[in-house]
Amino acid sequence: MIWHVQNENFILDSTRIFMKAFHLLLFHGSFIFPECILIFGLILLLMIDSTSDQKDRPWFYFISSTSLIISITALLFRWREEPIISFSGNFQTNNFNEIFQFLILLCSTLCIPLSVEYIECTEMAITEFLLFVLTATLGGMFLCGANDLITIFVAPECFSLCSYLLSGYTKRDVRSNEATMKYLLMGGASSSILVHGFSWLYGSSGGEIELQEIVNGLINTQMYNSPGISIALISITVGIGFKLSPAPFHQWTPDVYEGSPTPVVAFLSVTSKVAASASATRIFDIPFYFSSNEWHLLLEILAILSMILGNLIAITQTSMKRMLAYSSIGQIGYVIIGIIVGDSNDGYASMITYMLFYISMNLGTFACIVLFGLRTGTDNIRDYAGLYTKDPFLALSSALCLLSLGGLPPLAGFFGKLHLFWCGWQAGLYFLVSIGLLTSVVSIYYYLKIIKLLMTGRNQEITPYVRNYRRSPLRSNNSIELSMTVCVIASTIPGISMNPILAIAQDTLF
């Protein structure tokens, strides 16, 4: 009898929760319409996978890509609308959040074609791979629009769990298992530290969880200069630092880059940084408004360490993926300059512009690595020697993306860095910008070293991998080369006409 009553109570409680969730979705669903499109795509993928055989694999790519493109279209139609807070203050929709959501969707849209040939050659499960990619994208989008501490914690965990599963997708690879274990342990530790910081912020503000209400709560409790806020700031910086992977929170990055499947690395290398940057700007700028000097100092230290260590250690690497791992650590140091400058002097606009260029440069380089790896089976830098003699298009594409990453004119990377450094200089960050300029010169050195290997024409320097190089006969080869071409074009041409891009980025105040 008692069990029967408890069961009825459980059913009633579950029904109330479901009806409340349905009510929220019914009245607030339009505010998360791009996210709802991805959710619908996920459900459609699961339905088709459970009712069809492997012959319908092209449909999986089509559904995933289409849902991402429709979601991008929905975002563009919603551009310039008034800021809206929905779901009882949990989610905010404004131009600033939407441009980061657009960047995440763009990353995912470009990464799916990069994965087609790799998945077919390695015979990985296609449905689960695409499900994890779309779910991670969904988590990143919710993180960009998160407006309270609970959502800011849950959304990146959704992204992180999918990242762990993707990095360990090749279960038989020992390096992949080792990288996943390190990624999982460090990710769990960083999440606990992040929650610890949130708890201090929650208590100091008098029990507030919305970002703007936390500021009001700190004013009411007079705790905005208390030691608890300092503890919260340090803990949250450590937690977000793991997602951004600046030095010294970069230990997981080289191993995960080297051990994970290359398309997964391409996806994680850009989406995680875009989502974490969006979250960092809002967390530091709003709840820690009264501690701006402190978090500026912390981020300056992280930026200096990242730019110096990332670029210096990259010189010594022999693996292309590990080299790009340390290069990404240096690149996030440049992005942090934009976060420090903030809304004044177009800091956010320069950061967003540089991230757009970084997406194309980085994904273009990884597309070249995917193609070369599938056709030769190697990732070693010295094995790229003489690639120009066998595949001029691939060698030239690699060279352009690497030169753009290094910031050589007239490529997009040069203009992105130029505007970022100029904004930092105007804001008085002279030492930080000087370090950025010096480390950019260092990065040009190791990028040019690889380009020299690519373009060498002497027979004695051409490796057996390149000598036996063969193009892939698969038709899906067209999709990866299409993505590579798009990324190469985006790494070169937009730099010449930056004004429209900057104008759009400057319209993203929150």
Swiss-Prot record:
UniProt keyword terms in alphabetical order:
Chloroplast, Membrane, NAD, NADP, Plastid, Plastoquinone, Quinone, Thylakoid, Translocase, Transmembrane, Transmembrane helix, Transport
- UniProt GO molecular function: NADH dehydrogenase (ubiquinone) activity; quinone binding
Signal sequence region: none
Where is this gene product found?
Plastid, Chloroplast thylakoid membrane
Catalysis performed (reactions): a plastoquinone + NADH + (n+1) H(+)(in) = a plastoquinol + NAD(+) + n H(+)(out); a plastoquinone + NADPH + (n+1) H(+)(in) = a plastoquinol + NADP(+) + n H(+)(out)
Where this protein primarily resides, as one coarse class? plastid
Membrane-spanning ranges = 24-44, 59-79, 99-119, 124-144, 149-169, 183-203, 229-249, 295-315, 323-343, 354-374, 395-415, 418-438
Q: What is its EC number?
A: 7.1.1.-
| Subunit note | NDH is composed of at least 16 different subunits, 5 of which are encoded in the nucleus.
Question: What does this chain do?
Answer: NDH shuttles electrons from NAD(P)H:plastoquinone, via FMN and iron-sulfur (Fe-S) centers, to quinones in the photosynthetic chain and possibly in a chloroplast respiratory chain. The immediate electron acceptor for the enzyme in this species is believed to be plastoquinone. Couples the redox reaction to proton translocation, and thus conserves the redox energy in a proton gradient.
Q: What is the protein name given in its UniProt record?
A: NAD(P)H-quinone oxidoreductase subunit 2, chloroplastic
Organism equals: Ensete ventricosum (Abyssinian banana)
